[in-house]
Amino acid sequence: MDILADGEYRINDEIDIGGDGISNFIFGRGWLLEIIELSKGDFFFYSDDKEVRSTTTRFGVFYPPFTIVRPHVRNVKGRVIGFGAVRSVPELPQTPFIFDTDLDGILVNVDHVVRILAASPDRRSIVLNSKLSFLSIKAKRLIDENYLAYPSISRIAARLGVSPEHLSRQFKRDYYMSPSSYLHQLRVSEATFRLAIGEEIIDISNEVGYNDLSRFYKQFKKRTKTSPAECRTMLKKPA
């Protein structure tokens, strides 16, 4: 990952994911466009429990802020280029999708991304669930707005007029994870970006709401299967 100015970054890396698995992918603040070219394996998304695939081995994936998607990967090898930023860009779409593309070469800047997406008429939605309950939508919005302050799930439930148990059941039914799990994954996503831009681990722990450094390490390793220091090293490897 190459860190640019104004919270922008560029990706140019190999993909090598062994095995066969499905899991939720959480993208926090900011947005990202990836162009993926597969040389081996299978990579698609689930939307409303249906498979959404590219028709070619080269395709784009767009993630707007605070996205939850559900990819399925099977022994994938290939390459990914990408461009993302933390700052809001009004011209960009508000929902995640994939699209076929013949784009080759790096993504230059925000304007380049806007032009590419505007010229992608074959968009296929990868929204996890298009029939979310109003309760889950409101709960997710509250978490998205307050995740760095460590919002209490019990307090969110009370604010929404339901029990924590009812909120957790409905949220998990809609998003395939509990609200607590979503909160922690969102914070780890934020921590990963901060590691990439060179912030100190102890500062990151505090900034994403973990006042206890050991708890931060535990949650980070649980979600990423690696430590913050190891993750920083991987992010800084040359493409």
Predicted regions and their residues:
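Conserved metal-binding segment of the jelly-roll/cupin
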Residues: 55-68
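Short, Lys/Arg-enriched, Trp-marked, Pro/Gly-tolerant hinge/linker segments that flank
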Residues: 97-163, 169-185
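Generic protein-terminus/edge-of-domain signal
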Residues: 1-55
